[in-house]
């Protein structure tokens, strides 16, 4: 009997939730507010699944609900959903206000962090006027060549015709691309085994090269 490898990476657990509960956990685009007490439903539904633990589920759920994408969906008129995507009541104003406050605080922290990491311009000092006797011109040593900048990875969206079995690709899952290998291509469905061991089924527009 084969033992099931337990998922420990939060991104891999989120990918598993996107695949298992696609009407509740949205991988891309606008999300939906989750039902209050959803963690308990999730723990019960996955009680017999040895891939994930309650602790890791809680961490993944916290990551999902604290993302800017999720906090932006908590707004007036939005309906909470259960694991099957069924409406479970409209949001209360108190919860909307709390989500917007969290979003603003998170965005302000990110802005402050970017500002702190930005290079500060050196203060300009007024040059002192000093009489310097003229000297014969001497050759200046050549300036060293500037160091090459580190390469920047620019992903491009794959076309179905570009994809083959055993090809290494990156799958768009939320904010962070996850690396994996194509195991099968069935018409428009592409099966990808992630480096974490999880196999998911996606379309070509979700694959980056």
UniProtKB/Swiss-Prot annotation:
Region annotation Disordered: where it falls in the sequence: 105-148
Pfam families found in the cross-reference section: ProQ, ProQ_C
Highest taxon in the source lineage: Bacteria
Gene Ontology cellular-component annotations: cytosol
Record flagged with keyword Cytoplasm: yes
Localisation: Cytoplasm
SMART domains tied to this protein: ProQ (SM00945)
InterPro entries, alphabetized: ProQ, ProQ/FinO, ProQ/FinO_sf, ProQ_C
GO biological process: one example: post-transcriptional regulation of gene expression
Chaperone in keyword set: yes
GO molecular function, one term: RNA strand annealing activity
Major place of residence: cytoplasm
Keywords: Chaperone, Cytoplasm, RNA-binding
Role of this protein: RNA chaperone with significant RNA binding, RNA strand exchange and RNA duplexing activities.
NCBIfam families: PRK04950.1 (NF003434)
Homology family: Belongs to the ProQ family.
Protein name: RNA chaperone ProQ
Species whose genome carries this gene: Shewanella baltica (strain OS223)
